[in-house]
Amino acid sequence: MHSVVCIKQLPDSAQIRVHPVTNTIMRQGVPAIINPYDLFALEEALRLKDKFGGTVTVVTMGPPMAEAALRKCLSFGADDAILVSDRAFAGSDTLATSYALSAVIRKIMEDMPVDLIFTGKQTIDGDTAQVGPGIAKRLDYQLLTYVSRIVDVDTAKKEIQVERRAEGGVQLLETSLPCLITMLEGTNEMRFGDLDDLFRAARHELKVWDRVAAGIDTVEMIGLKGSPTVVSKVFAPKPRSKRAELIESHDSDPKNLAEAALAKLFTQHPNLEQEIAKRAV
């Protein structure tokens, strides 16, 4: 079984700041991390490898510094890693990114069939959840989104069964391979790399593919030229000036305090009392 895991290296969103004058993201000094949902995807691919054998290949599109993210994935147990890096990819939106990654996976399939493609459900910087489905569409793969757990894989029948988190419950889905899975935070925690994998990751000769090596003949479908979506502005929300209002009382009875708070609320929102009365009937 051959699984390809698409990951993204991005700035740690917990430490990102927006410049107060230019409204641009200040990346200086912000550490880079692997998109957390992509790590859940990697863990599921590695667990399938542990159970059924096979190969796990990790792919990322980004600048040369993304090599560190790939080596980290190798240290967890991935077998191979490909960095797709070219100035022509700069400014790619989700449409251009899915085009580029699907081309890379097609190139990989020239040497070895790909049974499963894993991505995180979305990245924490863009939150679009579009790249995974875009890859599946371009490769004509079955698509399973928002998967929380892989229940079973029948390698003989080439079928997979998963749990998909949906509003109000969990769906049990089954489809044929090959397919693409976008992973939620699952029931399995990310493993720690053992010493052998840590040393192997440090020595591993990464594949670095430019546009031509990835099999992309034209620049019209990648980068800014292939991106109909453009971010026009990034800004931090203005802080609200409103403050919480304190209701002072010397009455220690909780019921009386609650009634005082409700009276204040009904004064500010006259229709609210009527609405509550209707629902209580």
Swiss-Prot record:
Keyword check for Transport: yes
GO MF terms, alphabetically ordered: electron transfer activity
One GO term (biological process): nitrogen fixation
Disulfide pattern: none
Keywords: Electron transport, Nitrogen fixation, Transport
Family matches, as SUPFAM superfamilies: Adenine nucleotide alpha hydrolases-like
Function: May play a role in a redox process involved in nitrogen fixation.
Assembly: FixA and FixB form a heterodimer.
PANTHER family cross-referenced by the UniProt entry: ELECTRON TRANSFER FLAVOPROTEIN BETA-SUBUNIT, PROTEIN FIXA
Name of the protein described by the UniProt record: Protein FixA
UniProt organism field: Azotobacter vinelandii
